[in-house]
């Protein structure tokens, strides 16, 4: 089986969705978003007052969130830790937030390092997905370097192969265990059809020992990709990467075959539970069918 230090395998117990959902009837900050509806959702000047940014595909708000008390504050000195909240974009159904939440649960089940995550169902028309910031620990800033920045790669267009991702990970971290983590991330993206895997969605964090390690996963969700392809190809294959491509990648980057086979088997075994999880999270049935059909096609290529 794969080395447990680099691949934890399926979690002993997946978090129950209802435990991680939060109600916001008494929340002043998110309640104001709900009261104003979509008009505020797309008002970037209003979001900026809460620390938001118009950058990226979806509007964001930076808040202080305390999971224990469920208190949310727009003040930097508020209780809890800094959490970016991502809301659906114009014309999107709030289920996009539920899908990203479900993917965060599945990523953790598959052994990927994930920051704490929450789904915030604000009202029937409005939702948010939030994660704890990976560049803050105990109030201190953690140096983070994106792969796009390290390689001067244009994240706006497909420009990388996972061979480059793994080799860059080896060069930056000097740790083959981190390379194995990057391989696991590749397998997850292939199986779960996360094709928005561009160069800016891989990063490295500096440890207290002044060493670089692969950052926790982020921006994981179902995505069909540009023209149906992965932004980052797998040994040259972006449209339909399969078992042979993943094993060739492992061999090229000195990932032990036993570890690679274990990763593929474990992640594939975690695909089916996504269906019920999407339903619990409130994803529409037709969307569930679309997502699971894509995953089944991916599983057939990896069998």
Protein language model annotation of sequence segments:
Residues 26, 68, 90, 134-136, ...:
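Short, glycine-/Ser/Thr-/acidic-enriched flexible segments
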Residues 27, 91-110, 157-226:
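Conserved kinase catalytic-core segment
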Residues 47-155, 205:
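Conserved ATP-binding subdomain of kinase catalytic cores across diverse folds
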Residues 121-127, 187, 201-207, 266-268:
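A glycine-rich phosphate-binding loop feature that marks nucleotide/adenosyl-phosphate handling sites
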Residues 128-133, 216, 272-278:
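A short beta-strand motif that forms the metal-chelation/ATP-contact edge
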Residues 146, 152-165, 206-260:
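Catalytic-core segments of enzymes that bind and process phosphorylated/nucleotide-bearing substrates
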Residues 238-302:
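Mobile late-domain/C-terminal helix-loop "cap" segments
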